[in-house]
Regions:
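Active-site nucleophile and cofactor-binding loops and adjacent substrate-binding regions
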Residues: 69-70, 89-96, 116, 125-128, ...
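Short coil/turn connectors at secondary-structure junctions
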Residues: 85-86, 119-123, 239-240, 278-279
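Short beta-strand-loop/turn "lid" adjacent to the catalytic site in phosphate-handling enzymes
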Residues: 45-90, 99-108, 125, 251-255
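ATP-dependent carbohydrate kinase catalytic cores
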Residues: 88-118, 208-216, 220
Length: 303
């Protein structure tokens, strides 16, 4: 599971169990070859007849894979030749994590707002982090998207001022990923406080450890943008089976006291309120979705 910040690796044992689970900062490695070699050597893992499933924070286009938010790339053919004589399957990272929804336990899901049960239908998984990923799960198959690169609509005076400032500084229109992400937290706080060179961490801003009114306002704007993104993509994809939110940023941003606000913004629509009000929204607090998704692929498509 190769994100833009962290790389998580594991080996499947006896067709069902994950062993040798480990996590690394991907920036500590110059190449994917270095990373995989380091992992296999660390656990003295057998290299014989290995097959692989990789989820990558990049669009899957041809043989050359280029990550979007970091300077990292690799050749699919070279990686398969060097490490995986048994074959290599490649997925977008959030697409791979989307497969985990096929078997994720209902009792581990946290309902955002009043519970709507577990209706059938397409599902979407949204994971903000270094970037902003979204996958669609339909009839057991997970589909990758680049929905995070949609432009943010102007929905309020506050959002308008933020978007105008972004466009002035960057010479382009802001996308959802620009603001609903790690870099977006810092940018929004800097805009509100007029301190673009502040040294507050994203965690400090979201938890408001300094009792700072700009931190509260930053969080409010982020929840607004998050709920709007969830609403628009739910309408586009027809995800009547639910909207699933995951990743450390989702966990840090959405606390129990924020659920009703998120839900109200999500359902707000003069024409589609009834449709949206029947779509459940869940928060997943689990950093193993990539492994779980890979195991689903392994069990259902490879064995």
């Amino acid at each position: 599971d190769l994100g833009a910040t962290n790389a998580r690796l594991a080996i499947v044992n006896d067709f069902k169990d994950l062993i040798y689970k480990s996590s690394y900062k991907i920036s500590n490695f110059k190449t994917l070859e270095d990373l995989i070699n380091h992992y296999l050597n660390e656990f003295n893992a057998s290299r014989e007849n290995l097959s692989g499933i990789l989820g990558v924070a990049a669009p899957i286009i041809g043989n050359e894979i280029n990550f979007v938010n970091i300077d990292f790339s690799f050749s699919v053919k070279e990686i398969e030749k060097s490490f995986f004589p048994g074959g290599l399957r490649l997925f977008n990272d959030v697409q791979l994590q989307g497969y985990a929804l096929n078997s994720y336990p209902n009792d581990k899901l946290k309902s955002v707002g009043v519970s709507k049960g577990f209706p059938k239908g397409p599902k979407i998984l949204i994971i903000p982090g270094t970037g902003l990923g979204l996958s669609i799960l339909n009839n057991g198959k997970s589909l990758a998207t680049e929905a995070g690169h949609l432009n943010i609509p102007n929905t309020s005076d506050e959002i308008q001022n933020l978007l105008e400032n972004f466009k002035k500084e960057n010479k382009r229109t802001a996308t959802f990923e620009d603001l609903l992400s790690g870099k977006g937290i810092s940018y929004i706080y800097g805009f509100l406080s007029q301190e673009s060179n502040h040294n507050h961490s994203n965690e400090d801003i979201l938890n408001n450890v300094r009792n700072d009114a700009f931190c509260d306002e930053t969080k409010k704007i982020l929840i607004n943008i998050f709920a709007i993104f969830a609403k628009y993509t739910a309408l586009i994809t027809g995800s009547t089976g639910g909207v699933y939110l995951a990743g450390s940023l989702s966990e840090s941003l959405l606390k129990d006291d924020d659920f009703s606000e998120f839900r109200n913004i999500f359902e707000e629509s003069k024409k589609m309120n009834k449709y949206l009000s029947n779509i459940p929204v869940f928060l997943i607090k689990d950093n193993n979705l990539g492994f779980m998704g890979a195991l689903e692929v392994y069990k259902n498509e490879i064995i």
